[in-house]
Amino acid sequence: MLSLIWTVFFVHVAIYLINTIGASTIDGLLWLLYLKLPTSTSKCAQEQTRLKREVVQLKREMNNTSSQDEFAKWAKIRRRHDKTMEEYEKINKTLNAQKTSFDWSVKIARWLSTNGLKIFLQFWYSKTPVFALPQAWFPYYVEWVLSFPRAPMGSVSIQVWSNVCATAISVLAEIVTAAFMQMASRTAVPVAAEDKKEL
């Protein structure tokens, strides 16, 4: 079992990563992974892809066929195109409804596993000290702030520790990002070659 110190830290790392990568990016990736599973939704998505290809192919054929010179052929292709387009729109509407439902489920699960867990930990362990401070090292008012709101005096509360973790993670990420940006911006300085003398 992870200690409370590390649990809070890893929850804040997860929250930071989700906020940095982007919730919509993660939702899109999870949707693609969900479509790879053998479900009715994945079959619907495969059918949608097939119909989309067929609509594009029929549209090309229709554009390549002259409506004046070969009207019968063009009209036949047009009817097939319209029928396929209608099927495609129907499946697309169904798939969009399923994606919306999936997105809501993922958002709820993501919130419960990150921010919901953070709030629960802060409520459940509000009177529990995360760790104790050495006695007489800090003045009374500093101990009071560090134990705010309900932890015993002379200890660090989970709320304070949670804020420290969030701040430390974001500052560390900024430092690492700045270091990578600085390394990436360094370009090789060309060394002047000696002039070749012509003989």
UniProtKB/Swiss-Prot annotation:
Cellular compartments annotated: Endoplasmic reticulum membrane
GO BP of this protein: tail-anchored membrane protein insertion into ER membrane
Gene3D superfamilies to which the protein is assigned, alphabetical: Helix hairpin bin (1.10.287.660)
Membrane-topology descriptor: Multi-pass membrane protein
Cytoplasmic face residues: 25-110, 173-199
Source organism, top-level taxon: Eukaryota
Cellular component GO terms, alphabetical: endoplasmic reticulum membrane; GET complex
A GO molecular function held by the record: protein-membrane adaptor activity
Family that this chain belongs to: Belongs to the WRB/GET1 family.
Assembly description: Interacts with get3.
Task performed by this protein: Required for the post-translational delivery of tail-anchored (TA) proteins to the endoplasmic reticulum. Acts as a membrane receptor for soluble get3, which recognizes and selectively binds the transmembrane domain of TA proteins in the cytosol.
Protein name (Swiss-Prot/TrEMBL): Protein get1
